[in-house]
């Protein structure tokens, strides 16, 4: 069996992370070039992620924690909740990266609200 592979799957994205949910939906998140937000895409196939619309789930703070270098998000589904783990820093110390968590308690992470859970 041969599979056509698109390289890259999604342009200008670093630290890609793909999760396949129990319903067969694939979710894609990655660092964006501006390092200022967390985006999510969903599709029924991995190839479909390339054309799926990116939805912004969260934007960086203007100052203080989570205000700079939003980096390497991962999406997970744990015990009925959606979680995104990502790295972020303070605009005054961009290399003091720390891990943070976003949570969605709804069933659809593309439409239901996300909330900040803070630093891990």
What are these regions (language model features)?
Residues 1-120:
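Carbohydrate-active catalytic/glycan-binding domains of CAZyme proteins
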